[in-house]
From Swiss-Prot:
Disulfide bonds: none annotated. This is Depolymerase 1, capsule K47-specific. Optimum pH is 5-8. Keywords: Degradation of host capsule during virus entry, Degradation of host cell envelope components during virus entry, Host-virus interaction, Viral attachment to host adhesion receptor, Viral attachment to host cell, Viral tail protein, Virion, Virus entry into host cell. Pfam families: Beta_helix, Phage_T7_tail. The keyword Nucleotide-binding does not apply. Interacts (via N-terminus) with depolymerase 2 (via N-terminus); this interaction probably gives rise to a branched tailspike. Optimum temperature is 20-70 degrees Celsius.
């Protein structure tokens, strides 16, 4: 290869590893190919070659059929690698990455030109012993001709020779002009002495207002004069010395130039970016000034952004500078992270009681600072221990009006030695915005807005988490502690070992509702978690329009630790459990005053589950349920399990088989927590798509006891058919052992049946007792048969 070529190198095949002799900004700008004179094959990174180091690649494929390996740099001219910071000075000695990208593009363009058909040392175009293919026949006298045209006209050798001589002269003129004119930026033509020479002049002084750096050529009366042959130019004196004196009246035009710097040198200079135009009409300098001035870049402070080097100090410096700018109004307060940054835990990070252990956090965001830029922050996975910390947090105090947007945070969950590090943890701040952030593989939580200070009621206020992704978290996906007017909207949460979204507001007072105000959780997609949304000892939350699937316990759960979880709303959500899931919605430990409406609940043991007792004030409006294994509304077997509540008719997709799913847990069972549902509880039967209105409270059948002639036209006998027991006129085809009969508001248990009668014993306050009940079971009374489960669940 020509040694002037800097961005392309070819090696003979035979080895497997090859050096990359040039620098590059990104691996995607490097092309590795197998080549011959007639063929070329571009290789794919990872599958056909890989990087041994930053400056060396290794082939993973055979080279049969090829004789050379080519490594070429091809930098994107449209994909900007980085931006510039406000007020930066562009010098060759300290070019930033973006300037280098511009220089790379220009360098590759020059190499492409040289490789296409460069000049040799004599100024001739050099095809380098390669054919020029697909050349059209020449038309004009100065056109090149192809072999067919030459063969056709070869008979007229004299004419051909003459044409070739003319062509040679024209090409020589062009090459000479191209070789001599090294300027990139030309000035306008300058006319000597108002267009008329005095005569006899051999020296002309250029008296332009701007300095001339070169004179590529001059014309005397239209005849081109070549530098070095017809004249010379002295840069210091600005004088042209002519080989032949001028004649009186000669018209002399001098072509001047503002710069004689090579392209590479010019682009590397402090004015290089101002010499490159863009499609919008701006120069690169103008464009970068307009964009770069809006951001603080960690690269300005030494960040490498290769995903390997520890860039924590540079990233923290960018945050601190942005904070200083926000305080003083002296520059941008937005930090742009666009690289791939490795960060270690900061051993000097401060602890916050109950939230952060000292030395367990990496970066401290500051008030009024925004982070954005599609960059990646990777936590160095070599950390140990399990104390709580965070990749990005605010150990120095509240960070009102901060934002974090459009970055990725990798926590190293699957490779880290230690645990306990949350992706983002913001404490005690107002107007916090976290949007379009991806927190992946966290060893603890994903995104937390919590309360750390001992004073004040609330944690973070007037804040929003939107459009974020939390995947593979070691604990909770998104958590808020004591929120005030916070919104969690449009997030994707997947694979959390605990809750998808968690709202915590407990206070040590059992007489009050926990602390939370105006919390909206909407439009989130939550999957593969323990519980989809967990409302812990607080109220005033609105959970609506979320898609929660593959939860292992409950889709949504309301729980009390000390203070209550009251005054909540749960509407229009899709709640689909994983295999073995407990309930679509759970209420636990004296919580309530919640409206549950228009939700789709599917694939769980229970549709709605109430445990712990004292669940109060549930307003369960119509919901759609499907594949409920046991009960639509389960209430734990204890008195006052559910009080002052109602359930409207639920819509069930499917059929009830053998009383399953039941509408509710048993109600009014005299021997088993008769006040399980108490203090005005209204329950409506559910409606099934396959059967219409279904049985309620395990009511399997009802009817009227028939009189039997052989029994003296009675419907019940005592101590006649079965000694010491009462029998009624039901038989084994209508009732089963263990079922219950309600007759005249009394409850009887069926203890045996035959083809003609059923033996019943009455609940007498402590047990089902044998006795004479025929005297009260008269006049063909109505009866209700309730299933065995009614008395057992």
């Amino acid at each position: 290869m020509d040694q002037d070529i800097k961005t392309v190198i070819q090696y003979p095949v035979g080895a497997t590893e090859f050096d990359i002799p040039f620098d590059y900004l990104s691996r995607k700008f490097v092309r590795v190919s197998l080549v011959t004179d007639e063929n070329r094959r571009l290789l794919s990174n990872i599958t056909e070659y890989r990087y041994v180091s930053k400056t060396r690649v290794k082939l993973l494929v055979e080279t049969d059929g090829f004789d050379r390996v080519e490594i070429r740099r091809l930098t994107s001219a449209s994909e900007r690698v980085v931006d510039f910071s406000d007020g930066s000075v562009l010098r060759a000695a300290d070019l930033n990455v973006s300037q280098i990208q511009s220089a790379h593009i220009a360098e590759e363009a020059r190499d492409a030109a040289l490789m296409a058909m460069p000049q040799d040392d004599a100024g001739n175009l050099d095809a380098r012993n390669r054919r020029i293919v697909r050349l059209a026949p020449g038309v004009e006298g100065t056109d090149a001709i192809n072999k067919n045209q030459l063969d056709t006209t070869l008979g007229d050798a004299g004419g051909i020779l003459s044409d070739m001589k003319d062509l040679e002269g024209e090409i020589h003129d062009y090459i000479e002009k191209f070789a001599d004119d090294t300027a990139l930026v030309r000035g306008v033509a300058w006319v000597y002495n108002l267009g008329s020479a005095d005569g006899g002049e051999t020296v002309i002084t250029i008296n332009k207002s701007t300095r001339t750096y070169a004179v590529p050529y001059i014309e005397v009366n239209g005849s081109r004069q070549e530098v070095g042959y017809h004249y010379s130019f002295d840069l210091e004196t600005q004088q042209i010395t002519l080989a032949t004196p001028l004649k009186a009246g000669d018209f002399v035009m001098v072509m001047t130039t503002e710069s004689q710097l090579p392209v590479e040198t010019l682009l590397a200079s402090s004015v290089g970016a101002s010499s490159i135009g863009t499609a919008t009409g701006e120069t690169v300098e103008e464009r970068l000034t307009r964009l770069y001035g809006h951001f603080v870049h960690p690269e300005t402070y030494g960040a490498v952004g290769d995903g390997i080097t520890d860039d924590r100090v540079a990233l923290q410096r960018s945050l601190d500078v942005a904070y200083e700018n926000a305080l003083n109004g002296t520059g941008p307060s937005t930090v742009r992270w666009s690289g791939d940054y490795m960060v270690s835990l900061n051993p000097n990070s401060l602890g916050v009681s109950g939230e952060l252990a000292a030395g367990r956090s990496a970066l401290c965001i500051r008030p009024g600072v925004s982070i954005e830029g599609k960059g990646t922050v990777r936590l160095d996975p070599s950390f140990t221990g399990s104390q709580s910390g965070a990749v990005i947090t605010n150990w120095a105090g509240p960070v009102d009006d901060c934002s974090i947007k459009d970055i990725r945070i990798y926590g190293g969950k699957d490779v880290a030695t230690g645990t306990g590090i949350t992706g983002i943890l913001i404490l005690d701040s107002q107007r916090v915005v976290i949007s379009d952030v991806k927190v992946l593989n966290s060893t603890a939580g994903g995104i937390y807005l919590r309360k750390g200070a001992t004073e004040g009621l609330y944690g973070c206020s007037f804040s929003k988490v939107s459009g974020c992704t939390v995947d593979n978290a070691g604990y909770i996906g998104i958590q808020m502690e004591r929120p005030y007017d916070n919104t969690v909207i449009g997030n994707t949460i997947n694979r959390c070992e605990d809750n998808g979204i968690d709202v915590f507001g407990n206070v040590n007072d059992a007489t009050v509702t926990g602390i939370a105000q105006s919390t909206l959780i909407t439009g989130n997609n939550i999957r593969d978690v323990l519980n989809g949304v967990f409302i812990e000892s607080c109220g005033n939350t609105n959970i609506t329009g979320n898609y929660i699937a593959d939860f292992r316990s409950s889709g949504v759960i309301y729980n009390r630790i000390n203070s209550a979880a009251n005054d909540n709303s749960l509407t229009s959500n899709v709640l689909i459990g994983a295999s073995g899931a407990s309930a679509g919605v759970s209420f636990k430990n004296s919580v309530g005053y919640c409206t549950v409406a228009s939700n789709r609940i599917q694939n769980s043991d229970y549709g709605i589950r109430c445990v712990g007792g004292g669940i109060t004030g549930l307003n369960i409006l119509p919901n759609t349920m499907k594949n409920i294994a046991k009960t639509l509304l389960f209430v734990e077997a204890r008195n006052n399990g559910l009080v002052k509540s109602r359930m409207s008719t639920q819509f069930y997709e499917g059929a009830q088989v053998g009383g399953i799913p039941s509408n509710t847990s048993p109600r009014g069972v005299p021997h088993r927590f008769p006040s399980r549902l108490s203090y005005i509880v209204d329950i409506q039967p559910f409606w099934a798509t396959e059967q219409g209105t279904r049985e309620d409270n395990f009511e399997r059948a009802k009817g009227t006891l028939a009189s039997i002639t052989g029994w003296g036209s009675k419907c019940a006998l005592y101590d006649t058919i079965v000694a010491g027991d009462t029998v009624v006129s039901l038989n084994s085809s209508s009732v089963a052992v263990g079922e219950y009969l309600e007759i005249n508001a009394e409850v009887y248990k069926v203890t045996s049946v035959s083809a003609t009668y059923a033996v019943v014993r009455k609940w007498t306050g402590s047990d089902y007792t044998a006795g004479d009940y025929a005297a009260v079971i008269i006049s063909n009374p109505s009866y209700i048969i309730r299933r065995v489960q009614w008395g057992e669940q």
